[in-house]
Amino acid sequence: MPLNFAVTGVAGYISPRHLTAIRDTGNRLVAATDPHDSVGILDQFSFDVRFFPEIERFDRHLDKLRRGPEENRVHYVSICSPNYLHDAHVRLALRNGAGVICEKPLVINPWNLDPLQELERETGKAISTVLQLRVHPALIALKSRLDMLPQAHKHDVVLTYATARGYWYRVSWKGSEERSGGLATNIGIHLFDLLLWLFGGVDQSEVHLKEPRRMAGFLELKRANVRWFLSTNIDDLPFTAQPGSRTTYRSILVDGKELEFTEGFTDLHTRVYQRVLAGEGFGITDARPSIELVYQIRNAPAVKASGEMHPYLVAGLSHKNGKGERK
C-alpha cells in the first residue's frame, strides 16, 4: 500500500527532487505547504494535493489526518524549507506522528541534535536526512577501495567547489548566515559529510579565507589531509559561465587523481528515499559529524596557514585554470 507524504517548502529549488522520489518509490503526495504560492509544479505529480500557504493550517490538517482512518494519515513529512526552519518542521512532523526525511543540513546548530533524538525516542518515529553523495555509485566504489588500504596511510585531497550565484543569493535567506548557516553549511555540508565519510574524523581544522562569497581552509582527517575551497563567486569558475549554461565546478583530487562523479546525480534522492523506506536511512548519528564541523568552521577566525593551503590561495584568486594555477 502506498504511503502518504507531505512536504514543507514545496515552492523551493530542492523540492522537485523530493516530489520525484516520492512518486518513483510508489508513494503519494497528499499535502504541502509554502508561504509562496507559485506551486503549479504540484500538478505534475497529482491534482489531489492539499496546499497550505500557512504552516499553522498545514499543521492542523496533518493533525486531523492523524486522528482519522489509518489509510489517510501522513506517514512521512519531507522537509525542503529554508535551513533555519528545519528543526521546527522536524518537530512539527514528529508531533503529528510522521517520520521525517529532511534536506541537509538537518539543523544549523549542533546543540539541537540531542533534543531531536529525545523526540525520536518519545514518538517512536525516525528522523532521516538527505546525504545523497553517500549513495552515489562512484563514491561508494571509492570508499570500498579506500577501506581496503592501510588505515595509517594519509591521502592528499584537494576539494574545489565553485557555483556561480547572482545578486539574488545575497539578499535571500541563503545569503544570511543566521538563516542558512553560511557558506560552509549551505553549499559545503554535503561535501564535508563526504570527506568525513571517506576519510574519518577531524584531528585539526584551520580556516584560511573567510569572506561572504568565499571560504577556504585545511582539514587534517584520520586518513587524509584536505585543502578545501568553496565559492559562489562567478570569477572563481575555471571557465566562462553564461546565464542558462553550466555554472558549477566541482573537483576532488585524491593523491593527485581526479575523482570523477559529475554524472549520476539524477536519481540520488530516489536512492535515499529507498534506503529510508527500507529502514536504512541516514539518521542523526550520521549527520552529526558534518554539522559539528561546519559549525566549527563558521565560528573560526581566518588564520595564517600553518601548513598547506589550497592551490587557489597559493596562486592568487584570479586567472586560474581548473587546478588553481595561473594561466
Which residues make up each language-model segment?
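N-terminal Rossmann-like dinucleotide-binding module
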Residues: 1-48
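Beta-loop-alpha module in the N-terminal Rossmann-like domain of NAD(P)-dependent dehydrogenases
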Residues: 51-101, 105-118
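A contiguous active-site-proximal alpha/beta segment in oxidoreductase catalytic domains
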Residues: 84, 107-167
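C-terminal substrate-binding/catalytic lobe of Rossmann-fold NAD(P)-dependent oxidoreductases
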Residues: 214-268
